[in-house]
Regions:
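Non-heme Fe(II) oxygenase catalytic core, chiefly the N-lobe of the double-stranded beta-helix
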Residues: 1-175
Length: 175
């Protein structure tokens, strides 16, 4: 397997791809993940995200096998706000919202008492245009906050209030 970054000055995410056509199958990737789990855990902690790119993952079932190889204690109790479609026991669509409806930067289910430790994303059908999964290292966002603000968050906590307009509301003034 080879490792690289999408750009020289950004180490999020760490990209891992197969060295050759023989190393790009789902079964090879599952075995490699199982054999290298502790190193992958360290890399995930260091970089914040790992992108497995160019592997032969063709179905939600294939993707679930990859996720289970990395974490055999997956959860499937989705409590988010975006409409989702269940594909397998542990794989859901990212959103059933129309493509013109943006999904803003967020910390997935951070409003829960115990937010997910890990998230796995998979692109089954690549969009003809656009399409994105923006990622952000919120550890850096936290470190960039003014220390006084961080202290307030730590002492007082955070209250989440979500105000969403419906997907069919095209008004830019809807809050």
């Amino acid at each position: 397997m080879k490792e690289y970054y999408l750009s020289e000055n950004n180490t999020l995410p760490l990209v891992i791809s197969g060295d050759n056509d023989d190393s790009k199958s789902k079964d090879v990737l599952v075995k490699w993940i199982e054999e290298n789990k502790s190193q992958l855990e360290q890399k995930l902690t260091k970089h914040g995200a790992i992108l497995f790119r160019g592997f032969d993952i063709n179905t939600p079932q294939d993707f679930e096998a990859i996720a289970k190889a990395f974490d055999n204690d997956l959860k499937n109790d989705y409590l988010g706000t975006s409409p989702r479609d269940k594909k397998t026991d542990f794989v859901f669509s990212a959103s059933e919202l129309p493509p013109h409806y943006p999904i803003m930067q967020h910390c997935e289910m951070s409003f829960l008492p115990s937010a997910p430790r890990r998230l796995f994303f998979y692109c089954h059908i690549e969009p003809e245009y656009g399409g994105e999964t923006p990622v952000c290292d919120f550890r850096k966002v936290y470190n960039d906050l003014d220390p006084k603000i961080r202290t307030e968050f730590e002492q007082k906590g955070v209250k989440h209030i979500r105000n969403y307009s419906s997907p069919d509301n095209k008004s830019k003034n809807a809050f």
